[in-house]
Amino acid sequence: MSKPSYVKFDVPEDLANKVLDAVRKAKESGKIKKGTNETTKAVERGQAKLVVIATDVQPEEIVAHLPLLCEEKKIPYVYVPSKKALGEACGLQVAAASAAIIDPGEAKDLLDEIVKRVEELKGKAS
């Protein structure tokens, strides 16, 4: 399966798992936004510390604007393979196409590590 047009770089499975773990921890001890509307608003307001986008979203247009918006606002973003797993990490019973970490809480160190690895991946992709 080819990757969606909005996916700008590949994320290794171990990093994707760390991202989901960071979302879980931030949900419990910090603050997150769930879903594309809330995520978009958090990015536009400059509140997001990390944006997480699922790569299995249909239609792609639902999240296609997020990578560009994040780059414009200088907010790091990363991909996870499953909207269902992202929804579960957010504490939802349903899938989530995207989410944003606003306050990482106890996930601060994990978030810093993720952002560093994402910058390295983006450097390789360009």
Curated annotation (Swiss-Prot):
Organism superkingdom: Archaea
Keyword Methyltransferase assigned: no
Predominant cellular place of this UniProt entry's protein: cytoplasm
Matches recorded under SUPFAM superfamilies: L30e-like
Swiss-Prot/TrEMBL keywords: Cytoplasm, Ribonucleoprotein, Ribosomal protein, RNA-binding, rRNA-binding, tRNA processing
GO biological process, one term: tRNA 5'-leader removal
GO molecular function: ribonuclease P activity; rRNA binding; structural constituent of ribosome
One term under GO cellular component: cytoplasm
This protein's record includes keyword RNA-binding: yes
Location of this chain's protein in the cell: Cytoplasm
Record-linked HAMAP family: Ribosomal_eL8 (MF_00326)
Function comment: Multifunctional RNA-binding protein that recognizes the K-turn motif in ribosomal RNA, the RNA component of RNase P, box H/ACA, box C/D and box C'/D' sRNAs.
Subunit structure of this chain's protein: Part of the 50S ribosomal subunit. Probably part of the RNase P complex.
UniProt cross-references to PANTHER family, sorted A to Z: RIBOSOMAL PROTEIN L7AE FAMILY MEMBER (PTHR23105)
Family: Belongs to the eukaryotic ribosomal protein eL8 family.
UniProt protein name: Large ribosomal subunit protein eL8
Organism of this sequence: Sulfurisphaera tokodaii (strain DSM 16993 / JCM 10545 / NBRC 100140 / 7) (Sulfolobus tokodaii)
Gene this chain is encoded by: rpl7ae
